[in-house]
């Protein structure tokens, strides 16, 4: 009996310790579960659960697959705007491109933060819009000191993707009013592979295009108003979403005023100095005329060096052509003055030749009339003898006229002739002193009114 009682005691003790151990294990599990509920999930575990291999997320498939298209809201912040080249017709810009869309697969509630800023390397793990710049000629990413990219995920599944880019974009220019022109350069954002059934781009409602404070351009004034438009593209492969922004750039002509207009104006005025130089100073006037013509030609060539070879006439071409015409006309004016002033020599030479011919002709005529007078006398005597004298008289009581001898004006002396032609040449110089500046002033009035006022207003009306 003692042995049985001892055995029962051992069995009851065993069950007691087993129950105690079981209770301790249950308490430990409850404590661990309570701790797990109170302690947040680690970021690594959360990301693995959200977009890891075990999450079932596939970056190759767009959100809302086989459903409504994904709406991507775009925003651009311009850091710098410059390097506008007329020869290649493009411009260079540095921007922050920001895209926002909703991916329901990335919505979460397990993590306490409202948003997560992820490393750029995570971009390969999620779906992204296939945006590209339709009028892009060259582009660069920025990797100093690290990739200039931002990825932010919000609780409701919204995704913000920002990237810094330097772009060279084409900008077809109309240079008819150069350098008083206003250019419109566009930036087109388009989907490369997704049609509008899958993806739609749209501008952000508030401040879709922002410009860095204090941004200035060396030759242009970037206007505050920017046109935001939709430019949906239709190709053989489908209809693709496209949005664009138009930048209006008004050229500041201060550089061209100093480098082109004022120097050419001074060259034209310098060519008028020859009108005040004595006409006998041929070397001085010819040298001045040729120098101004060559300088004007060089100036005209320089104005076209930085411009493309276009088929139409630009405003600067008209200015340079008219200035060259005035300078060349001033040189021709001296040629006319010199020609007129030397005409008395030619006239004297012509008179000498004519005088010699006239004297020879007069002698011949004198001898001819002498022979005729002798014959007439003989005839008169013979007719009178037969009573026919009155027949030699004219009818109606008119007497016959003798040979015509017009009254000849005495020719002027060589000095008088020289003075007449020199006065004519001086008169040409005197008229040129007034006519050339007046004609150039009239041209300036028409030129600046047409290009700076009338055409400028037409351009603004077209843009509005």
From Swiss-Prot:
Main localization (coarse): membrane
One Gene Ontology MF term: glycine binding
Cellular component, GO annotation: dendrite; glycine-gated chloride channel complex; glycinergic synapse; intracellular membrane-bounded organelle; perikaryon; plasma membrane; postsynaptic membrane; presynaptic membrane
Binding positions (Zn(2+)): 225, 227, 248
Glycosylation sites: 71
Signal peptide range: 1-33
Keywords for this protein: Cell membrane, Cell projection, Chloride, Chloride channel, Disulfide bond, Glycoprotein, Ion channel, Ion transport, Ligand-gated ion channel, Membrane, Metal-binding, Phosphoprotein, Postsynaptic cell membrane, Receptor, Signal, Synapse, Transmembrane, Transmembrane helix, Transport, Zinc
Transmembrane segments: 256-277, 283-303, 315-335, 431-451
Localization annotation: Postsynaptic cell membrane; Perikaryon; Cell projection, Dendrite; Synapse
Positions bearing Phosphoserine: 370, 379
Subunit-structure text: Homopentamer (in vitro). Heteropentamer composed of GLRA3 and GLRB. Both homopentamers and heteropentamers form functional ion channels, but their characteristics are subtly different.
Name of this chain's protein: Glycine receptor subunit alpha-3
């Amino acid at each position: 009996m003692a042995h049985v009682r001892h055995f029962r005691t051992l069995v009851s003790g065993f069950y007691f310790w087993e129950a105690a151990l079981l209770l301790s294990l249950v308490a430990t599990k409850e404590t661990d579960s309570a701790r797990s509920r109170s302690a947040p999930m680690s970021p690594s575990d959360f990301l693995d659960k959200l977009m890891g291999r075990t999450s079932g997320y596939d970056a190759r498939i767009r959100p809302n697959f086989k459903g409504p298209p994904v709406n991507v809201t775009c925003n651009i912040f311009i850091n710098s705007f410059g390097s506008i080249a007329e020869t290649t017709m493009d411009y260079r810009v540095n921007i922050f491109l920001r895209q926002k869309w909703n991916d329901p697969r990335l919505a979460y509630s397990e993590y306490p933060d409202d948003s997560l800023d992820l490393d750029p390397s995570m971009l390969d793990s999620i779906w992204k819009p296939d945006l590209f710049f339709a009028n892009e000629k060259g582009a660069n990413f920025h990797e100093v000191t690290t990739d200039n990219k931002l990825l932010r995920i919000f609780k409701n599944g919204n995704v913000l993707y920002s990237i810094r880019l330097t772009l060279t974009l084409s900008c077809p220019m109309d240079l008819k009013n150069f350098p008083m022109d206003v250019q419109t350069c566009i930036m087109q954002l388009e989907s490369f592979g997704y049609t509008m059934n899958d993806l739609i781009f749209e501008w952000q409602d508030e401040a879709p295009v922002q410009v860095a404070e204090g941004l200035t351009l060396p030759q242009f004034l970037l206007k505050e108003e920017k046109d935001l438009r939709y430019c949906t593209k239709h190709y053989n492969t489908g209809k693709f979403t496209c949005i664009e922004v138009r930048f209006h750039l008004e050229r500041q002509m201060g550089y061209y005023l100093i480098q082109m207009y004022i120097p050419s104006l001074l060259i034209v005025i310098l060519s008028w100095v020859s009108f005040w130089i004595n006409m006998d100073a041929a070397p001085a006037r010819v040298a001045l005329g040729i120098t101004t013509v060559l300088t004007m030609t060089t100036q005209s060539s320089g104005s076209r060096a930085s411009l493309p070879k276009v088929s139409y006439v630009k405003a600067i071409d008209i200015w340079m052509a008219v200035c060259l015409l005035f300078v060349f006309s001033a040189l021709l004016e001296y040629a006319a003055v010199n020609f007129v002033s030397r005409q008395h020599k030619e006239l004297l030479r012509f008179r000498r030749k004519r005088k010699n011919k006239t004297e020879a002709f007069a002698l011949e005529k004198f001898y001819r009339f002498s022979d005729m007078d002798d014959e007439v006398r003989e005839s008169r005597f013979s007719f009178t003898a037969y009573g026919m004298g009155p027949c030699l008289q004219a009818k109606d009581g008119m007497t016959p006229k003798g040979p015509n001898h017009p009254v000849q004006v005495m020719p002027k002396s060589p000095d008088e002739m020289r003075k007449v032609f020199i006065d004519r040449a001086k008169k040409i110089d005197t008229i040129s002193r007034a006519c050339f500046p007046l004609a150039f002033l009239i041209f300036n009035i028409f030129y600046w009114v047409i290009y700076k006022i009338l055409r400028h207003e037409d351009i603004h009306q077209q843009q509005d």
